């Protein structure tokens, strides 16, 4: 495929003066407008000998033509014309442009840069103490192409806070906002590209590589960044060197040969070549000449698409070439636009219509691009089509196109434009435009771009591979990079269909670490990690011990977490107990509601009235205490579990004790004594008994908390792969402390009711209390051995079950039968049945209640 070098660097790409008719292409590099944009493009190059022999600060003649620079300039022209022809960004305004050739040399670049900063209508930069109101000839500058030039112009324009948007300068140093506060670019920093390169090396396990850079700022900085990134990713650089720029001197030739010799001696198969196109041209020329063994060359963006390199004779002998290329939106109409402009440049009528006299800039600086007016349009047009179809130019063309749109968007924001007009009452200074460019978003075709804090844009990269088609290669996309690398292995071509291996030592297996031998960390032996340790990273040199809360088998690559083990809310046992809680609590609330509804009934009054309801409330609180047992143990929950369970139970049992005492008194003592004692057991003194019992239990709980406080324990020994967390009981004595009061109350209740003989024809309250206390003792006596033998992790579930079944036993044997009478046997809800006397007898104080009761029964 004919490349751009055939068009731009050989005699076939341009004609010397006098060969063919003159064009007026250079006269199209300026257009008037309300706001002028400066442009710096590599329209030509100069002979190196001319620069070496320069002894005076005179002008430099650019004799060779660069088609790439022309295409980039055309991209800027097309973008400006699009903006002017539309109304979305700058309605009612026109952008102008003033484009100059940099000749790819700093000396040449400074001349138009000085002209851009000259005061409007003059050719000089005035000296002021304050440049706030200074109005230069241009509002912003697009370019230059190379980082070397941008380092110079960036500092110069930053002094005046002149916005500068480069379409290709990618050096990371340009991201320094203190040095280059007004510099922006529509390409990512080289650091991003090198991160992609390091990711590519890691993907193919190429950890033994050579790194070469051009002997200039671009190459040296690239090598420095790559070296740091490679070291942090475990990639060893066997050899690092600088390649001099293309020179025919013997000294430079010796340096190139020495670089090639050291690369060969390092026995690497992969070389990262971060260099300018001219340095790569020099390196590959001698590599082909000296028959260097083929390598995998990882290219920087600066030379991956360079025709200077791609058209070298026998270039296929260098090996495989891979590199990342910034992705950009396609501009399908660009080819037609360039062809139209080139055709107009050859049209005498059109050329005659252009202004014939020299403008101010040309009088000072000479023609903008004299060599542009003597090119062969047919070769240039065909070369453009071929390079665009091969994907070698569109990313640079789009970057230039986007740079213009970024400035237009900033001007749009500064002028507060709407769909119909812009506010142009006052002139816009460059520094005002700059204020709107920081972190600004803008659109270029279908892409939304944004300047980051360092003035760069974040764009996706395509991974390109040279595929050989005689005589020159073409670029195939074989992957993408946007923070992560995506490869299309089926599209990659390798010698012998095998991916080259570039390693000093084989990769260690999983669970093995490296024992370095020699000086390079990539040369090592592999050693297994023992149990209890693991290999943290593939490039580790020592096994990392597992933490106390972790474990690992032998030859492990990770430590498995020892999951905390406790009675979780979602475990089946807990869910079952929670369902039981809902049942018991629901029955308790239903009983309480029923007794409140029938408050004045004989049954409720005979059961103790308010004391009975208080006992039910305590029973409900006793049930709710089970909610303290599931879940991850905490100090507060551990301390609260036993007191919050047994204090409500004491309140409940104390009310039952009062009823048991009343039953005992009524049955075993003379009537006169019984009436006197019952008045105390039912009156305010009854609450004193409840209070005293509760205070005794509270005192025992306080003793329990102070003398034997439970604590949250993390047990690492019980389970091999889990860590047990539980509330540890200090001793069995502590458990007995909180049960003393309740056990005594229950025992007294049992004695007071078990020995009592029920009277026929009356409700047998003693039987319900007897069975309730039996249920209490059976459950809590069974609880002790079960708690002692069950796995520690499930001890809270045992306590929950004991609490709920205890509550259910009391409820089912004592309270629910009374609810049954209230709902389904209302005819028994009488004073005779529950108190053993009629209303009349009660009022007369008659004690012959037994006969009345027997009469009711008959």
From Swiss-Prot:
Residue ranges that the UniProt entry lists as topological domain Extracellular: 21-575, 632-644, 709-735, 789-796
Quaternary structure (record): Forms homodimers or heterodimers with TAS1R1 and TAS1R2.
GO CC, any one term: membrane
Region (Disordered): 839-858
TM region positions: 576-596, 611-631, 645-665, 688-708, 736-756, 768-788, 797-817
Entry's Gene Ontology BP terms: detection of chemical stimulus involved in sensory perception of sweet taste; sensory perception of sweet taste; sensory perception of umami taste
Broad class of the protein's primary localization: membrane
PROSITE patterns, per the entry: G_PROTEIN_RECEP_F3_2, G_PROTEIN_RECEP_F3_4
Ranges of the Cytoplasmic topological domain: 597-610, 666-687, 757-767, 818-858
PANTHER family the record matches: CALCIUM-SENSING RECEPTOR-RELATED, TASTE RECEPTOR TYPE 1 MEMBER 3
UniProt signal peptide: 1-20
Residues with glycosylation annotation: 85, 130, 203, 264, 379, 387, 418, 439, 482
Top-rank lineage group of the source organism: Eukaryota
Role description: Putative taste receptor. TAS1R1/TAS1R3 responds to the umami taste stimulus (the taste of monosodium glutamate) and also to most of the 20 standard L-amino acids, but not to their D-enantiomers or other compounds. TAS1R2/TAS1R3 recognizes diverse natural and synthetic sweeteners. TAS1R3 is essential for the recognition and response to the disaccharide trehalose. Sequence differences within and between species can significantly influence the selectivity and specificity of taste responses.
Gene name linked to the record: Tas1r3
InterPro entries hit by this protein: ANF_lig-bd_rcpt, GPCR_3, GPCR_3_9-Cys_dom, GPCR_3_9-Cys_sf, GPCR_3_C, GPCR_3_Ca_sens_rcpt-rel, GPCR_3_CS, Peripla_BP_I
Keyword field: Cell membrane, G-protein coupled receptor, Glycoprotein, Membrane, Receptor, Sensory transduction, Signal, Taste, Transducer, Transmembrane, Transmembrane helix
Protein name: Taste receptor type 1 member 3
Cell inner membrane keyword on record: no
GO molecular function: G protein-coupled receptor activity; sweet taste receptor activity; taste receptor activity
Subcellular location: Cell membrane
Family: Belongs to the G-protein coupled receptor 3 family. TAS1R subfamily.
Topology class, membrane: Multi-pass membrane protein
């Amino acid at each position: 495929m004919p490349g751009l070098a055939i068009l731009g660097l050989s005699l076939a790409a341009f004609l010397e003066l006098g060969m063919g008719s003159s064009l007026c292409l250079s006269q199209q590099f300026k257009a008037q407008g309300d706001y002028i944009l400066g442009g710096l493009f590599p329209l030509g190059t100069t002979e190196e000998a001319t620069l070496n022999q320069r002894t005076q600060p005179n002008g430099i003649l650019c004799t060779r033509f660069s088609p790439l620079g022309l295409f980039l300039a055309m991209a800027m022209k097309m973008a400006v014309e699009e903006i002017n022809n539309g109304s979305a960004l700058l309605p009612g305004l026109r952008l102008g442009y003033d484009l100059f050739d940099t000749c790819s040399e700093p000396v040449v670049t400074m001349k138009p840069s000085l002209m851009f900063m000259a005061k409007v209508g003059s050719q000089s930069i005035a000296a002021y103490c304050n440049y706030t109101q200074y109005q230069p000839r241009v509002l912003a500058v697009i370019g230059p192409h190379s980082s070397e030039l941008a380092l110079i112009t960036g500092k110069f324009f930053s002094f005046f806070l002149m916005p500068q948007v480069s379409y290709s300068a990618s050096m990371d140093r340009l991201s320094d906002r203190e040095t280059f506060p007004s510099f922006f670019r529509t390409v990512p920093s080289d650091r991003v590209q090198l991160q992609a390169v390091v990711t590519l090396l890691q993907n193919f396990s190429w950890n033994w590589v050579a790194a070469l850079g051009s002997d200039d700022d671009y190459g040296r900085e690239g090598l420095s960044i790559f070296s740091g990134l490679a070291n942090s990713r475990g990639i060893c650089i066997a050899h690092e060197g600088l390649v001099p720029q293309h020179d025919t001197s013997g000294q430079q030739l010796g340096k190139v040969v020495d670089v090639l010799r050291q690369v060969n001696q390092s026995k690497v198969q992969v070389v990262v070549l971060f260099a300018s196109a001219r340095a790569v041209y020099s390196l590959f020329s001698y590599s082909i000449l000296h028959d260097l063994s083929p390598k995998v060359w990882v290219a920087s963006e600066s030379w991956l698409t360079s025709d200077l390199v791609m058209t070298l004779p026998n270039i296929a002998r260098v090996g495989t070439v891979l590199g990342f290329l910034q992705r950009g939106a396609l501009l399908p109409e660009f080819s037609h636009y360039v062809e139209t402009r080139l055709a107009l440049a050859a049209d005498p009528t059109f050329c005659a219509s252009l202004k014939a006299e020299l403008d101010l800039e040309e009088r000072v600086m000479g023609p903008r691009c004299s060599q542009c007016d003597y090119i062969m349009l047919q070769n240039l047009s065909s070369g453009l089509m071929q390079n665009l179809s091969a994907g070698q130019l569109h990313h640079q063309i789009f970057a230039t196109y986007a740079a213009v749109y970024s400035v237009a968007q900033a001007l749009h924001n500064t002028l507060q434009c709407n769909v119909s007009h812009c506010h142009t009452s006052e002139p816009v200074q460059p520094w005002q435009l700059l204020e709107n460019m920081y972190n600004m978003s803008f659109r270029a075709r279908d892409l939304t771009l944004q300047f980051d804090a360092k003035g760069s844009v974040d764009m996706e990269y395509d991974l390109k591979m040279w595929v050989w088609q005689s005589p020159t290669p073409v670029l195939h996309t074989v992957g993408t990079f946007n923070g992560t690398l995506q490869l299309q292995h089926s599209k990659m071509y390798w010698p012998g269909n095998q991916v080259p291996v570039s390693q000093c030592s084989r990769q260690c297996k999983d669970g093995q670490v490296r024992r370095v031998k020699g000086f390079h960390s990539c040369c090592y032996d592999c050693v297994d990690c023992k149990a209890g340790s693991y290999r943290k990273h593939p490039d580790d040199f020592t096994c990392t011990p597992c933490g106390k809360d972790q474990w690992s088998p032998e030859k492990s690559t990770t430590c498995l977490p020892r999951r905390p083990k406790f009675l979780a809310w979602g475990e089946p046992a807990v869910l079952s107990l929670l369902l039981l809680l809902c049942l018991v609590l629901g029955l308790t609330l239903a009983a309480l509601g029923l007794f409140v509804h029938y408050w004045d009934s004989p049954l409720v009054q005979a059961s103790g009235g308010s004391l009975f309801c208080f006992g039910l409330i305590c029973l409900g609180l006793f049930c709710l205490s089970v909610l303290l047992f599931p879940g991850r143990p905490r100090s507060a929950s551990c301390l609260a579990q036993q007191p919050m369970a047994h204090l409500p139970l004491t309140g409940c049992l104390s009310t039952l004790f009062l009823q048991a005492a009343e039953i005992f008194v009524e049955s075993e003592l003379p009537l006169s004594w019984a009436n006197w004692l019952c008045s105390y057991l039912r009156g305010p003194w009854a609450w004193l008994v409840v209070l005293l019992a509760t205070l005794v239990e509270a005192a025992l709980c306080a003793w329990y908390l102070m003398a034997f406080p439970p604590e949250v324990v993390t047990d690492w020994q019980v389970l091999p792969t889990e860590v047990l967390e539980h509330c540890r009981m200090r001793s069995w004595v502590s458990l007995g402390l909180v049960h003393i009061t309740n056990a005594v109350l229950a025992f007294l209740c049992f004695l007071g009711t078990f020995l009592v003989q029920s009277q026929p024809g009356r409700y047998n309250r003693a039987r319900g209390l007897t069975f309730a206390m039996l249920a209490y003792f059976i459950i809590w006596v069974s609880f002790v051995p079960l708690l002692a033998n069950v796995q520690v992790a499930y001890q809270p579930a045992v306590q929950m079950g004991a609490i709920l079944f205890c509550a259910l036993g009391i409820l089912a044997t004592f309270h629910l039968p009374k609810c049954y009478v209230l709902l389904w046997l209302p005819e028994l809800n009488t004073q005779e049945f529950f108190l053993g006397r009629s209303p009349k007898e009660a009022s007369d104080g008659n004690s012959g209640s037994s006969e009345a009761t027997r009469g009711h029964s008959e």
